Design a protein with these regions (language model features):
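Flexible, membrane-associating and regulatory peripheral segments of lipid-active enzymes
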Residues: 2-130, 134-139, 146-152, 156, ...
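The conserved beta1-alpha1 loop
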Residues: 110-112, 187, 212
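Glycine-rich nucleophile elbow surrounding the catalytic serine of serine-hydrolase chemistry
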Residues: 185-196
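Non-catalytic cap/lid and distal C-terminal segments of serine-dependent acyl enzymes
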Residues: 156-157, 193
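Conserved hydrolase catalytic core segment
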Residues: 199-205
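Active-site nucleophile loop of the alpha/beta-hydrolase fold
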Residues: 209-217, 239-243, 261
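Flexible "cap/lid" loop of the alpha/beta hydrolase fold
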Residues: 217-229
Length: 345
């Protein structure tokens, strides 16, 4: 109840209107009239949408006035330093002393709640890209993701995305970065950080990949406050715990639903959804390295979720570079329960 009480108390303080009573469990629709907010111990707490949105509106005022801090660090990995990152800043001295090379494509990778730049997802995705050749892989470390309170981390998403955009703009304006060579890849809350980065870049980044974009405290009906398909020239979403920790409705221009997008094989009961949620990062790293996730085109996302898209594989591979030029729609992705997870007909 900790999160609910905090939200309710703050909402009372900022609103002249009385709050509605907490909805009965039978009336709750996650993402529609409220959210189950994840807790650090893996449990979740229900918060009515009106309560949460009043609190977020008040908190946005504090964020906008600079009354909160949003520390963000950037670590560059290249084929010359594939395992030990170089911390870079938006200064010519810093970039000049690093191995950044504008002639090579650039990939930004952004972690989610409770994580840091040392998280295994960053290592896996970094290694996958560097296994393919010369890339600038920049891992974003945003400290407020490590708040024990999920809502506090959510409120840092916009400001963090703007700081990522500032780094992109600096590299473009001063060090020859070509936006057509830029991918921004984010998991969970990091997917929405990627969206805000795209919204605030001077020009359009080529691709954003949202790895199971977080659902709690984000509304499908407010695309300007979440990752959406207009945030880059091409946006791809890989949705693995839809309707729980991640969105179920399609987020990207290309929306991919491994195993139907709700739960993943090999995760067991997965009562919290954490295993399925994390599989999006594992699948993506494997897709980058092996290009082995075949997909089946669906008429709509409901068909992808129900796995009723037929059995004919398309020419589209989940996570492939070519998707930006040929993909528009929803895809069902068959997967194995163990690595290699990808399946090709």
């Amino acid at each position: 109840m900790k999160t609910f009480l905090i939200l309710a108390l703050i909402a009372v303080a900022v609103s002249a209107f009385p709050l509605k009573e907490e909805l009965e469990e039978s009336e709750r629709i996650h993402g529609e009239n409220g959210w189950y907010i994840p807790q650090e111990d893996g449990s979740s707490v229900w918060v009515n949408m009106d309560v949460a949105e009043q609190w977020m509106e008040a908190q946005e005022l504090l964020e906008g006035r600079g009354l909160t801090t949003v520390p963000v660090k950037f670590y560059l990995y290249t084929s010359s330093n594939p395992t030990k990152g170089t911390k870079i800043t938006t200064t010519t001295k810093s970039i000049g002393a690093s191995n950044f090379n504008a002639a090579h494509p650039t990939r930004f990778v952004i972690h989610g709640w409770t994580q840091s730049y040392t998280a295994s997802m960053n290592k896996d995705i970094r290694s996958a890209w560097l296994s393919r050749g010369d890339y600038n892989v920049i891992i974003v470390d945003w400290a407020r993701a490590r708040s024990v309170d999920y809502a506090t981390s959510v409120m840092a998403v916009s400001s963090t995305g703007k700081k990522v955009a500032s780094m992109i703009n600096f590299l473009k304006d001063n060090h020859g970065l070509n936006l057509n060579d830029v991918y921004v890849i984010g998991h969970s809350l990091g997917a929405h950080v990627a969206g805000y980065a795209g919204k605030n870049t001077n020009g359009q980044v080529h691709t954003i990949v949202g790895l199971d974009p977080a659902l709690p405290l984000f509304s499908y009906n407010k695309p300007n406050k979440r990752l959406n398909s207009g945030d880059a020239w091409y946006v791809e979403s890989i949705q693995t715990n839809g309707g729980n920790l991640g969105f179920l409705k399609p987020i990207g221009k290309g929306a991919f639903y491994p195993n139907g997008g709700k739960s993943q094989p090999g995760c067991g009961l997965d009562l919290t959804g954490a295993c399925s949620h994390a599989r999006s990062t594992t699948y993506y790293a494997e897709a980058v390295a092996q290009d082995n996730f075949g997909s089946i085109k669906c008429g709509d996302y409901e068909s992808a979720v129900s796995k009723e898209c037929g059995s004919t594989y398309s020419s589209v591979r989940m996570g492939a570079d070519t998707n930006a030029y040929m993909v528009d729609g929803d895809f069902y992705v068959p997967v194995n329960s163990n690595a290699p997870f990808g399946m090709i007909n």
